[in-house]
UniProtKB/Swiss-Prot annotation:
Record gene name: eno
A Pfam family of this chain: Enolase_C
GO cellular component: cell surface; extracellular region; phosphopyruvate hydratase complex
Signal peptide: none
Pathway recorded for this protein: Carbohydrate degradation; glycolysis; pyruvate from D-glyceraldehyde 3-phosphate: step 4/5
Record keywords: Cytoplasm, Glycolysis, Lyase, Magnesium, Metal-binding, Secreted
Name recorded for this polypeptide: Enolase
Length: 429
């Protein structure tokens, strides 16, 4: 039985130069593990609370309070517990915090410990993390949803949609999918240069040109796909993260592309996109609390495209259950730091899958070199992962880990491909 012997924590920097929490954990059998916590730019109102220091240090974004919460509160509570009882440990963390949003200890402190425990337990058992968490049947490699053009809160441009993604659904393996995505990424750079547009990068490694709007961006990416030698819709298809909460004002509506629009008008816009482009997924097309709009949108186009709830669900089983009951969205975006423990994350994924919802594993805009989400995507069989462009080491680290997992699985590995979008990919062919 691997017993937790030591727990340490420190403040490190994420990919945006902001502080975040790193936790180290040692077991009595000599096993050591480390986990680092990501942070988002466009954060949902209902996410678990990150504990930040305030004051002048790091512009108020320091995490010394969260580090001390690990050292002073969490460590004494979990030392002596068995690392292979993840659910019991995570429940102890929740009980210790005692708040519904993890605001006392901080979700960043709690998650760091939760993830470090799972990694230590896997190492102690002599298993890769994906196998330890997913069991003997974990073998599906996810489609990389590569954010190659950044807008919204991830870029300083006039483009309202936050992420324009390519999905190499026609590739025969994850290794080839990664190559296809990288080739499209470089092709897009050439397309942008030829048109005199900026090739500067946004938070997640995608290009951040100041283009006219959504359709102009999709046209650029479509051209890049074809210029790279791939067939649009069959080999490589398109996806969006609109992050609509960022431009929604209660009582006013959606301030989108220089117009104020209702949820119904946004729905009409998305329907027009589906008529013109091979889109398989739209994330956060409406605001996080626009339940009626979400239900109506899902009724109208939910049979044509994957509608992913990010800010809507915040990886929270309770909000997801409400969405399922209402008929809002048909897929869940999975971000471990939105909910704050591994157990709650796994519960949300299980609820989604058992209810016929797809899942997409996701990074945050403020990332680290930690690769846990790559293993987690394979462990739960998400079939989709969103972890940025094939550029910047904090993004590529996850893709490279998936390459290693595919090699480890050998002949047992299966790339999700268009089966990740069983109802929608067929319409693109």
């Amino acid at each position: 039985m691997p017993i937790i012997e030591q727990v340490g924590a420190r403040e490190i920097l994420d990919s945006r130069g902001n502080p975040t929490v790193e936790v180290e954990l040692a077991l009595t059998d000599g096993t050591f593990a480390r986990a680092a916590v990501p942070s988002g730019a466009s954060t949902g109102e209902h996410e678990a609370v990150e504990l930040r220091d305030g004051g002048s240090r790091y512009g108020g974004k320091g995490v010394d309070k969260a580090v001390q919460a690990v050292l002073d509160d969490i460590a004494p509570a979990v030392i002596g517990m068995s690392a292979d009882d993840q659910r019991l440990i995570d429940q102890a963390l929740l009980d210790l915090d005692g708040t519904p949003d993890k605001s006392r200890l901080g979700a960043n402190a709690i998650l760091g410990v939760s993830l470090a425990v799972s990694k230590a337990a896997a190492e102690s058992a002599g298993l890769p993390l994906f196998r330890y968490l997913g069991g003997p049947n974990a073998h599906i490699l996810p489609v990389p949803m590569m954010n190659i053009l950044n807008g919204g809160a991830h870029a300083d441009t006039g483009v309202d949609v936050q992420e324009f993604m390519v999905a190499p659904i026609g590739a025969p393996s994850f290794k080839e999918a990664l190559r296809w995505g990288a080739e499209v990424y470089h092709s897009l750079k050439s397309v942008l240069k030829k048109q005199g547009l900026s090739t500067g990068l946004g938070d997640e490694g995608g290009f951040a040109p100041d283009v006219a709007g959504t359709k102009a961006a999709l046209d650029l990416i479509s051209s890049a796909i074809e210029a790279a030698g791939f067939k649009l819709g069959t080999d490589v298809t398109l996806a969006l993260d609109v992050a609509a909460t960022e431009f929604y004002t209660e009582g006013t509506g959606y301030s989108f592309e220089k117009e104020t629009r209702t949820a119904e008008q946004m729905a009409e816009f998305y329907a027009s996109l589906l008529d013109a482009y091979p889109l398989v997924s739209i994330e956060d097309p409406l605001s996080e609390d626009d339940w009626d709009g979400w239900v109506s949108l899902t009724t109208q186009i939910g049979d044509r495209v994957q509608l992913v709830g990010d800010d809507l669900f915040v990886t929270n089983p309770e909000r997801l259950e409400e969405g399922i009951e209402r008929g809002a969205a048909n897929a869940l975006l999975v971000k471990v730091n939105q909910i704050g423990t591994l157990t709650e994350t796994l519960d949300a994924v299980a609820l989604a899958h058992n209810s016929g919802y797809r899942t997409m594993m996701s990074h945050r805009s403020g990332e680290t070199e930690d690769t846990t989400i790559a293993d987690l995507a394979v462990a739960v069989g998400s079939g989709q992962i969103k972890t940025g462009a094939p550029a910047r080491s904090e993004r590529v680290a996850k893709y490279n880990q998936l390459l290693r997992i595919e090699e480890t699985l050998g002949d047992a590995a299966r790339y999700a491909g268009d089966l990740a979008f069983p109802r929608f990919a067929l319409e693109t062919k």
